Amino acid sequence: MGQLKVKQLETPGEKAKYTHYLIKDLKALDKMLEEDLIEKEPIRIGAEQEFCLVTEDYFPSKKCMEVLETIDDKHFTTEIGKFNLEINSDPLLLKDKCFSELDTQLQNLLTKAEKASNSHQTKTLITGILPTLRYKHISEKYITPKPRYYVLNSALKDSRSQHFNIHIKGVDELSLFHNSVMLEACNTSFQTHLQINPDEFVDKYNWAQAISGPVLAVCTNSPLLFGRELWAETRIAVFTQSIDTRTNSLVFDEKQSRVSFGASWEKGSVTDIFRDHISRFRSLLTSNEQEDSLEILNKGEIPKLKALQLHNGTVYKWNRVCYGVGGGKPHLRIECRYIPSGPTLKDEIANMVFWVGLMLGQTEEYKHISSKMEFRSAKNNFFKAARYGMETKFKWMDKLISAEDLMLKTLIPIAKTGLQNAGINKDDINLYMGIIQSRVKSLNGSQWMIKSYKNLQEEKSRFESRQQLTAFMHKHQFGHKTVDNWETLSDYRLNDIKNKPIVKHRMKTNLFMVYESDSLELVSHIMKWKSIHHLPVINNKKELTGLITWTDLIKLGNLDLRFTVKEAMQTELITISQEKSLDKAKQIMQEHQINCLPVVHKKTFRNTYY
């Protein structure tokens, strides 16, 4: 989709015309399969490296267009958020030192990006979800200023006719309504591509589904969103809900989310997979660059199947089927979309090597996996891995097994054999599979981040802890040590962080509030139980309407505790915005001689600064 000028499908005529070309693309693909035109070998690999742009104090930067212009390299492109960019690697033949060559290529490109970013007071970071993200960064003003992103945002919003409802429950809980698809921009991935022989495509696709849970478990690197500890790989939950075009869970024409693992094992041919997608998910976009693929094929040329690729670009399976043309030859690929970016480039390449090795190493025991494993087990394994990472218990071939045992005893040996049989350099196999093996025995990205985050909070605020985490990851992302060798942080501070602390960064977040209708007796006991002296008062709209203090209760006396909060609260309040500086907050408190300063945003009570 990124290469096409797209527009939203609106009129019945536009939809009919686009569908006409879409059906022709399917027929052309069938014809190419029948005539054995799809390339079978050599096999190629490739990757899409998404990364974040951060300011000098490690907050999201809005300078993607400026940085992209300075980079001036065709390998780079935009993402939906202004604080993200993407690198598309060159395709490489699957042989010898291809993985270390990819490592070097991405290292050079990321170094180029870092240098260009620095000229705009910006840094680059590879991580699954940027720890310093705040709610304001997912507003529409952070959408990258390119027409296709506004068109996609509009199309997805129109297909829902209501706000996106995000609810994720982990150790903490996140629940919010959002009016755009910008939550998608929270996710940063390392998407890996493997060319597949068309004769074995469906069986290979089902195998890719079967191994998704275990591969994800060892790769998890995104446990935090807006400071909350959610899933080991929170990207899975965020992306599933942020692109969901269903208005609720009961929809007749789309029982799956556009972001999904699937509903069953695939059967038939690769064209049947595309047919299923088209049957389930209505087209959202069209382009003026349509072509009659059958006519092109009849001329002896190879069509690009533009209509099909455009539709496929709005269906986000975690294992996505891809069609492409390279060197005048059509080919099929599986795109693995669930692997996160980071925490180091070496970790990312190791993740890819593990996945490719497993895909290549599929033994006779696992051929036709659809007849040997229940699909619900594969799907359940995937989402359990997203929640719990390496702490997952998998159901593998009808047996329960720990993630560690499954990796060390079964999957790592399969992957090594697959790589050896493909002629991959022995040193590369030892290096990258050694990283996976060491990570299984120690820590992966999400485990390191959670342990470090908890340790840092013993001395620092949640905001400072997230900032220091981000600073450390930036400093070490291209180092020789992979995450399995990182020490968990307990006290870390970079002197080059240029902090301009605001109220949002230091305000108390774990607060008790009372309603106007609550009794003063309840308020009195809450204050005694929790040893607090101030309680914000809110109405049913969550708007701050008053403040009740222990001094107020003393003045009233016990006889009046039967009355409501509304009858006794202070209503002439001094408040502050969460975006104001800490110096301003301190100044206000000193001037008015107060010990509690409520923080509000658009009349809604947020928290309190003491």
Q: What is each residue range found by the language model?
A:
Residues 513-531, 538-539, 557, 575-595, ...:
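The conserved cystathionine-beta-synthase
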Residues 552-553, 567-568, 581:
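Histidine- and aromatic-rich ligand-binding microenvironments
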Residues 498-511, 562-573:
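Bateman (tandem CBS) regulatory domains
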Residues 1-497:
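Phosphate/nucleotide-binding catalytic core
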Residues 501, 518, 548, 563, ...:
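Short beta-to-alpha loop/turn elements within the nucleotide-binding domains of ABC transporters
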Residues 600-610:
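Short, intrinsically disordered, charge-balanced linker/junction segments flanking boundaries
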Residues 490-500, 550-561:
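Glycine-rich, positively charged N-terminal anion/phosphate-binding segment
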Residues 545-553, 595, 608-610:
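Short hydrophobic beta-strand motif reused across regulatory alpha/beta modules
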